Each structure stands twice: as C-alpha cells, then as structure tokens.
Regions:
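Extended beta-strand-rich architecture
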Residues: 1-205
C-alpha cells in the first residue's frame, strides 16, 4: 500500500453514498464546489484518486490513508480512521504468470495484519456480516471485539453501484483504544520486604 494524504473536505454527492445515518457537515465558504462538506468517510477521496491514477494508466492500485472523519458539528464528533483500498489485481503469480483477481479474503488478510500490528490478536475479535450499505452484501464483514462492545473495523468489496471490482477496509482507532483500555491486564505491583536481604551457606559432612 502507498500512503495518501487528502483533504478533510469532499464532494457532497459522493459523500452521501458513505455517510449512512450521519449528519453532513456543510462548509459555508468551500474552496471548491466539489469540496463542500467535511467527509464522513475516507473512502470518497481515496476512490477519487484511485480512479484518477487508473485514468493516467496506472494499473494495480493499493492506497491507504490515516485521517479524521466527521460525524457531526459538535466538539468531539470526529473520529480517526485507517482506510485502505485496492483495485482489481494483485501481484503476478510466478508459477502461472497470470494475474489473479483480488477477493474478499485478500482484503480481510490486510485488515487482520493491520490489527495485529496495532496490538489486536486474532483471538480478540470475531467477524460478523453486519456491514454498512456501501459494502457489497455477502462479500464483506465487520470486525467486532470479542466482548461484542466495539466495532473495530469493516472490510470487503465496495458496492458495485459505487465502484466496481474494488475492495477496501476500515479500522476505527478510537474504538480500538477504548477496547484495549477496558481489557488491559494490569500486573500486580512488586512488593518489597522490610527486612534486609540475607544469604546462608550450609555445608554438611
């Protein structure tokens, strides 16, 4: 994956496809007509640049971004998300020299590996099929903490009405931190004796 840094603004038309039930935060004086709302998801901007790269002749695409998303106008209604997106192909198979289409298992592997790097082990989460509407039903999943209290991320094929043959994943860093803070194992404090240390050397005949 190549890292991408984009605006926190995006086009309201594409943002509406990803906002679900969230509130659109409109900008009073946007710098451009296609950057007129704060993004509810990182996907709109990633899709924009992915398609732009494809139009310039770049074939395989795998890009990601770490940045803020906005769920409302009030203070604190901002979330930090890791989002990655892949288009169409993976690396060539050295044995057959043919390119293999990406499937949901490839993007799931990317998500699981990312969670592992962030300190979440495989036995700390389960996969459910309750994903947002911008994912393809049946070709996507939601990663939920083992206690069922936190949605750590989503992965899968993006809905073909939005973009075809494209897979992505999201990791919600605040949820990850909240889960870890509530399930951290604290070691017992080390207790020292009030008495001086002494050693004895016994010899028996």
């Amino acid at each position: 994956y190549l890292e991408t840094i984009t605006w926190s603004f995006t086009d309201e038309k594409i943002n509406n496809k990803f906002k679900e039930k969230l509130e659109s935060v409109k900008i009073i004086n946007p710098i451009s007509s296609d950057l007129n709302v704060l993004r509810n998801s990182l996907y709109p901007n990633l899709i924009f640049y992915l398609e732009k790269n494809l139009n310039r002749g770049f074939g395989d695409q795998a890009i990601f971004e770490i940045g803020p998303t906005f769920t409302g106008k009030k203070p604190g209604q901002q979330k930090t998300v890791v989002c990655g997106i892949k288009k169409q192909f993976i690396d060539e198979d050295n044995s057959s020299k043919n390119k293999n289409l990406i499937d949901v298992f490839h993007i799931k592997k990317d998500l699981v590996q990312s969670l592992t790097e962030l300190g979440i082990e495989k036995d700390e989460f389960i996969v459910e099929d309750n994903t947002p509407s911008y994912y393809h039903p049946g070709i996507s999943g939601s990663v939920v903490s083992i206690d069922g209290n936190f949605v750590l991320g989503n992965f899968g094929a993006l809905h073909p009405k939005i973009i075809s043959n494209t897979f992505g994943f999201e990791i919600f860093l605040e949820n990850l931190v909240d889960y870890k803070s509530k399930n951290i194992k604290i070691k017992e404090s080390l207790t020292f004796s009030d008495y001086q240390k002494s050693d004895r050397d016994f010899a028996f005949l």
